[in-house]
Every structure is written in C-alpha cells, then in structure tokens.
Amino acid sequence: MIIRPGSIVSALQKLSCLAAVLGLAGIAPAIAAEPKPDAAVKMKYIDASVTLEKQIRTNAPLAENLLAEGKHWIEENRGNAAKEFKASPELFRDGRAWTFERSYAQTSNVGGRYVSIVRTDYVYTGGAHPNTLIDTILWNDETRKQISIRPFFKETADNGPTLKALRDAAIAAVKAEKKERGIEDSGDIDWYQGILPALLKVGAISLAPSTVAGKSAGLAFHYSPYAVGPYAEGSYTVFVPWETFKAHLSPQGLAIFGGDRPPDTKPDAE
C-alpha cells in the first residue's frame, strides 16, 4: 500500500516532542526528517504542498515539468477553498483548513529514456476521512515530455483486443492480491465494473522494473482506495508480466520489455 505523505500538524508535533525528549536525554533521534516541500501554500483555509522525490530533483527537465503541474494544482485548489471559505466560513473554524498534499515518486527508468512516476494526492476537505488519489505519469527523457503507453502496442482502441487483454489481466491480478491479503469480495458489489477496456479507465499504469538492465518486466496497475474495494482495504498496486500481453506489443514495445520483476520489488515501488 502506498503511504500517504504526512504533514499533518498533530503528527509533526508528536515527532517534535519526541525529538526534544530524546535530545534532553542525550540520545540522538533516529527519526528521518520529513522532506521539505518543493512548493507550499498555507492560509486560514488551505494547507497545500507538493513534494518531489530526491531522485526526480536530479532530473531538471522532469522536475520542472512536475513542479509546474503541482503548482497549478495548488492554485486551483486554493481558489476553490477560498470560495468555500467565503461562502461557509464556519466550516473552517478552529484551524480546520482544507489539506492538499501531492507527492511525486519515481518507480522505474527504462532504457535511460522512459521514466515512470507515481503521483499520490492526499486530500481532506472535511468528512469522515481523507481521500487518497493515485495516478501515474510516463516521461520521455529524450523528448522531455509526458507521453502515453500507446506507441508500445499495435493498437489501443477502446474495447479493442489490447485493452480487453489488459483489463482482464489487471482484474485477475487484483483478485490474486486480495486472496493473498485474505480478503473476500462482497457478492453485493461488483468492485471491478470500473476497470474498463479503455486506456484511461483500465487503471493508472507504470512500467515495472526488470531483472534485465534497460528493460521493463511488465506493467504495474495502481488503484486508489475505493477503486476496487472498500476504503478500509486501501490502495492496490498489482503487476502484470509482459509475456501476458506480448502478442499485442508493437516493435517499439518489444524493444523495451523483457526479463522478470526483481524478487525484492515491493508493490509500492512499482
């Protein structure tokens, strides 16, 4: 499960108090400092931040692109929060500002060209609990642009053979992960009806790392909480080996896939 970024005030206060106690006791705290946000806005009605993983910061064009996207996201949410604050100020009493935290993490670099990024948004605007939204970005280091996985396949038409194969493989992988977690789906809800044979609806996709240098072992599908199960189940990241969809790969796709997933790869590292 992907861990949400933690800049909640109470959590930081607890860490600060613990560090102070350890310092007074002459013990060096072994708690790693929270990464400093690359962009942040804090006002009466909003507490928002964007954080780039250290590895991303070393890639200047990529970092610039993602940071611009993140700042736009902050500004959009700031505007919405400002309107709500003006219309219903009582919702923001006692320091109850809306919280928006976005983090970008690099999960693979295939052939020194294709960089997979997982974008995680933590959002709380009141209600029973916060929401975590997960999406992915594929970056081409040569063209310095965000791209799609479409060129890796012979065709990617909605309801076409490629997307149907990917849809079926993704659902099977989620069911296998649920079985491993000891979770049984309720017969009252079809949690897989939202996974459709369309590139934008089959799931957030990233290129999984491989045991072969410069290759990808397959596709990782990332699902936010609520996407394929109740909120309590959390998020899912599942793996589909490249051999499963080999018949649908274009020459460009055949060139980047190969090998197996490293045995020590954790789901949230894909």
At which residue positions do the language-model features occur?
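Cleavable N-terminal signal peptides
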Residues: 19, 30-31
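Bacterial N-terminal signal peptides that target proteins for export
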Residues: 2-18
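Repetitive helical segments and hydrophobic/amphipathic motifs
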Residues: 22-23
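Compositionally biased intrinsically disordered regions enriched in Thr/Gly
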Residues: 31-270
